[in-house]
Amino acid sequence: MRSVSYVQRVALEFSGSLFPHAICLGDVDNDTLNELVVGDTSGKLSVYKNDDSRPWLTCSCQGMLTCVGVGDVCNKGKNLVVAVSAEGWFHLCDLTPAKSLDGSGHHETLGGEEQRPVFKQHIPANTKVMLISDIDGDGRCELVVGYTDRVVRAFRWEDLGEGAEHPMGQLVLLKKWMLEGQVDSLSVTPGPLGVPELMVSQPGCAYAILLCTWNKDPGATPTSEGPMEGHSGAPGCPGRCVAPDLWPHPQQERLHSPHRQHQASHSPDSSASGLFALCTLDGTLKLMEEADRLLWSVQVDHQLFALEKLDVTGNGHEEVVACAWDGQTYIIDHNRTVVRFQVDENIRAFCAGLYACKDSRNSPCLVYVTFNQKIYVYWEVQLERMESTNLLKVLEAQPSSGSCWESWAWILMSCPPPAPCFTKPSTIQTSLHSAPPRAPRTPPSWTGFLAEQGAFCTSPPPPPPQLSGIWKTGSAHYWGRMAAPLGCGDCRPPGRLGEGRDKLPLCPFPCVPHLSRQQALPLPRAPYSCCL
């Protein structure tokens, strides 16, 4: 297990207290760039944008906000912010700016009156977790709410009017499930036939899969909340629970796999339902395929309280991201390769996803809420690879496209040059020679050579800008503390290579004036333009 360090961090001001699920990332203003939404126990909803430490705008809600989300809950093609309080108040906030930003980049109403929800409705109280997603495969989003009293309810938005600027309608109860254990998290995963399945994690070493088949039953129609309140479920829509002795108590998240989705959608007979990850408070992490196939299990020595998914390598496969109370964060890929990252503060809430912090583009980020009234956003959380490697293996994997910049950088670190770039391995001299070494008589294909051992480089790069200077003796240049005469056919044809020291190739950098023997030339800040 290797450790990484991310240094690109933004500290956001946050003075309230929040529940673990009252934080999320999403595009609240429909500009394709994600923002950070945080709800506190006083009912204040704060939206952070870019790298500004202050909230971009705020919205005042009623009650203690226990969970927030961003999505097209009204199925209008427009994202809204959803905030649900412990008292059962459901809020819709339309935070798309109607006015331009001021000179400092803040919304014009930030310094004046706070934003207000455009819609509010009372639903059953004691909310804990929330999910906005298509759970029945009809192409429309539903709102799924998990409660502290072991109940899960599914709602759908029903329009009561058209043409209004803000939504006009109400939430209609679709289904109520009564479970045997507490609800810890909600997630959606594709089923065997590509139909979404609603997954609920529970204590007692179990999770439940709740089937939503009201669209397939002609006699089943959405009803109002009142008549459905006392029902445990309509016929044809049972809750399917896994036996309690199969899986540990999970906090779960859907783990996206393009290959698995492709197989499920094009192979109707396949029983594969994709991948999902599980974690427990005692530090157990598992990756599951289908309901009974364990791909791998990892045990760590920290108490894990949050589990997310994030593509940190850019290969299209999302990695599992688990966070512990003490700030230890684990990133694990499909092959059980583990990378860890430490935040030096205790954490009370965590989320991961895409956030537009810099350069007006979304990038992978990790968000930590501490007990010291701070929110830390680590942006550009990316890794070239998950597995450990060394520099020689990198060149061996890319013999044709390997950069000579990397080759010379390795040379400066006193590493042997890799075989793909050099025709002959060489022992690098780290001391500065006062005179150029004797070149080989008949090099196979000469545009540059290294000192002492006759290793040849087919396309030496311009001097790295971090070196202190170039030493020149005759027509040979020396970089830093390395004895490496250079020649580059890209700038001007090299001279004839003879037996004597005066027959070295012509200077590869015509923009550099001729210097006398052992005269130091300060290196410019930028590489030579003639060799780019």
From Swiss-Prot:
Keywords: Lysosome, Membrane, Phosphoprotein, Repeat. InterPro entries: Integrin_alpha_N (IPR028994), KICSTOR_ITFG2 (IPR031793), Quinoprotein_ADH-like_sf (IPR011047), WD40/YVTN_repeat-like_dom_sf (IPR015943). Its main location: membrane. It holds the Pfam family Itfg2. GO terms for cellular component: KICSTOR complex; lysosomal membrane. It is found in: Lysosome membrane. One of its GO terms (biological process) is regulation of TOR signaling. The modification Phosphoserine is found at residue 104. Residues 248-271 are annotated as: Disordered. FG-GAP repeats lie at residues 19-48, 126-155. SUPFAM superfamilies: Integrin alpha N-terminal domain (SSF69318), Quinoprotein alcohol dehydrogenase-like (SSF50998). As part of the KICSTOR complex functions in the amino acid-sensing branch of the TORC1 signaling pathway. Recruits, in an amino acid-independent manner, the GATOR1 complex to the lysosomal membranes and allows its interaction with GATOR2 and the RAG GTPases. Functions upstream of the RAG GTPases and is required to negatively regulate mTORC1 signaling in absence of amino acids. In absence of the KICSTOR complex mTORC1 is constitutively localized to the lysosome and activated. The KICSTOR complex is also probably involved in the regulation of mTORC1 by glucose. Part of the KICSTOR complex composed of KPTN, ITFG2, KICS2 and SZT2. SZT2 probably serves as a link between the other three proteins in the KICSTOR complex and may mediate the direct interaction with the GATOR complex via GATOR1. The KICSTOR complex interacts directly with the GATOR1 complex and most probably indirectly with the GATOR2 complex in an amino acid-independent manner. This is KICSTOR complex protein ITFG2.
